[in-house]
Amino acid sequence: VTSYTLNEVVPLKDVVPEWVRIGFSATTGAEFAAHEVLSWSFHSELGGTSASKQ
């Protein structure tokens, strides 16, 4: 089994509205494959307050 890790810091403050939904998408073209998100975390800081979801 091949395992990959994606880690990216993206400053969204200037490009998204106050409320957003986050989703995942994957493709292999015409071939069948199973994709699993085994874990993920989200952290947000707005005006001195912070919220985390894991």
UniProtKB/Swiss-Prot annotation:
The lineage of its organism: Eukaryota, Viridiplantae, Streptophyta, Embryophyta, Tracheophyta. Keywords: Lectin. It comes from Lathyrus hirsutus. Tetramer of two alpha and two beta chains. This is Lectin alpha-1 chain. Disulfide bonds: none annotated. Belongs to the leguminous lectin family. GO terms for molecular function: carbohydrate binding.
